[in-house]
From Swiss-Prot:
It comes from Streptomyces avermitilis (strain ATCC 31267 / DSM 46492 / JCM 5070 / NBRC 14893 / NCIMB 12804 / NRRL 8165 / MA-4680). The keyword Hydrolase does not apply. This is 4-hydroxy-3-methylbut-2-en-1-yl diphosphate synthase (flavodoxin) 2. It catalyses: (2E)-4-hydroxy-3-methylbut-2-enyl diphosphate + oxidized [flavodoxin] + H2O + 2 H(+) = 2-C-methyl-D-erythritol 2,4-cyclic diphosphate + reduced [flavodoxin]. Pfam families: GcpE.
Length: 385
């Protein structure tokens, strides 16, 4: 029998540019920056003071692949809940602090893995940096300097007229310099804007002027569809240039959706080992089957599969056989039937009514073999006879 490869390429695809060299920090047990893989994070939408609901949402995010979670802390009740949440969370918890510097200290004392501060709206922030640096250093707590276009310091708005890339970068580097004066460099930085073009230019300038790890984000990106497009465009541009160490896709949607999009962006750029990938044609007048329905049913049937499997669902004989051959598993449909391919070889032909069922069965067989041979989490391909 001809050998069939059931794994992934032994040499992963390289990003378009070499990764920017940045210093590495520890956010709890997770390394960010340096040679650490680009991580994906999100933010809870619950009231942090509701410990049960917040931990439940963190558990859902963790299951979806989230690696860092941020929680809001606008009140004393929220601050009081941080210790329990930080202790019980499966992933590092970052406290998101605005307006009140006292909550920065509360978050550090509570054992949060990191604290995000917004220099544009924390009262007397510059005067508090020395104390924050001392407390953070004592507890080993990194600080994220999170600059947002919507809350930029008034003096910078007066200087630049609006939230330009230069204004965002100046704000971030100024605050970083204050921490540096107190020998604190356990820092990561974000300079977010809701315009992807402004955001990309800001991060490019920032990357050229410092070696701190960078948290990428398009702030207030919008509803799911619009926000996904904005984030994909901005992150794709920066990550393909080697810029970015951790990402947060901001969507007006459930937080789990942010993780799905973020992971897909990294997989698409070769920055994360791909998991299940459905390749399907957009359909046209040549299609002899309902490609939309087939693709949706196959996707639903394989939801949750973690192995790096590429499945092609093709609707006609033009590109169908070629795409199916390039996939781990695929179907080229036409004339009321479908040819099922495994690694380029036709293994059977089935009626159209059996295509989805057959693809799912074959995918499960391949996944089981891959797991048995140690390739489920992205190890080199194996060959079976």
């Amino acid at each position: 029998m001809t050998a069939i490869s059931l794994g992934v390429p032994e040499v992963p695809v390289r990003p378009i540019a070499e990764r920017r060299v940045s210093r590495q920090i520890q956010v709890g047990p997770l390394a960010v920056g340096g040679t650490a893989p680009v991580s994906v994070q999100s933010m809870t939408t619950t009231r942090t003071s509701d410990i049960g609901a917040t931990l439940q949402q963190i558990a859902e995010l963790t299951a979806s692949g989230c690696q860092i979670v941020r929680v809001a802390c606008p009140t004393q009740d929220d601050a009081d809940a941080l210790a329990v949440i930080a202790r019980k969370s499966q992933i590092p918890v970052v406290a998101d602090i605005h307006f009140q510097p006292k909550y920065v200290f509360a978050a550090i004392e509570a054992g949060c893995a990191a604290v995000r501060v917004n220099p544009g709206n924390i009262k007397q922030f510059d005067d508090k940096v020395k104390e924050i640096a001392r407390a953070a250093k004592e507890h080993g707590t990194p600080i994220r300097i999170g600059v947002n276009a919507g809350s930029l310091d008034r003096r910078l708005l007066e200087k630049y007229g609006k939230a330009t890339p230069e204004a965002l970068v100046e704000s971030a580097l100024w605050e970083a310099s204050l921490f540096e004066e107190h020998d604190f460099r356990d820092i990561k930085i974000s300079v977010k804007h809701n315009d992807p073009v402004v955001m990309v230019n800001a991060y490019r300038q920032l990357a050229a002027q410092c070696d701190y790890p960078l948290h990428l984000g398009v702030t207030e990106a919008g509803p799911a569809f619009q926000g996904t497009i904005k984030s994909a465009v901005a992150f794709g541009a920066l990550l393909s240039e080697g810029i970015g160490d951790t990402i947060r896709v901001s969507l007006s949607a459930p937080p789990v959706e942010e993780i799905k999009v973020g992971i897909q962006i990294l997989e698409s750029l070769g920055l994360r080992q791909r998991r299940l990938e459905i390749v399907s044609c957009p359909s046209c007048g040549r299609a002899q089957v309902d490609v939309y329905k087939l693709a949706e049913e196959v996707t639903a049937g394989l939801e949750g599969m973690e192995v790096p499997l590429r499945v092609a669902v093709m609707g006609c004989v033009v590109n169908g056989p070629g795409e199916a051959r390039e996939a781990d598993l695929g179907v080229a449909s036409g004339n009321g039937k479908g040819q099922i391919f495994v690694k380029g070889e036709v293994i059977k032909t089935v009626p159209e009514s059996k295509i989805v069922e057959t693809l799912i069965e074959e995918a499960m067989k391949i996944a089981e073999q891959m797991e048995q041979n140690g390739v489920a989490s992205g190890e080199p391909a194996v060959t079976v006879s």
